[in-house]
Amino acid sequence: MKTNEIRKPKVIIEPVTSHDLQNLVALERECFTTEAYTERQIRDLLESPNAIAFLARIDADIAGFVISLVEEYEGAKIGHIVTIDVAIKHRRKGTGLTLLKAAEDALLERKARAVYLEVRADNTSALQLYSKQGYVKTEILENYYSCGIRALRMTRNLES
């Protein structure tokens, strides 16, 4: 490695377990303010038989997590990425992208044909990430967040 190169940390993806709940809640509160899911909401999401959840680790740190659901819509399976959280100190290291791809791969394995998510309209870094991965804006959701900020629904086809 050259001296002026920055080593990109290795992101390890693993399934979320019930033992991770408190860490997920703490990370959710770090990442979001008024929109943060409560402990009960996170637990309920994780206990859903349709849930797919992964944790990202960098060294010993929990760097982030993703929770997604497989939903049925007009007889087709559709993935819903409910939340992607990346710890502040682990942003801009590929953690969000790694979590997004892990969720998409798992949704595809569960026969989801497409995936959608909601993102704050003012979250430019997330919007750039999703757009680069082929997500397109499909709906504007006015006053989606409790603070009155709109969300954008973005969708991506998972079928090749």
Name each region found by the language model.
Residues 1-6, 143, 148-160:
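Terminal substrate-recognition subdomain of acyl/acetyltransferases
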Residues 6-11, 15-89, 100-102, 106, ...:
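Acetyl-CoA-dependent GNAT
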Residues 32, 65, 90, 129, ...:
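Conserved hydrophobic/aromatic "anchor" residues
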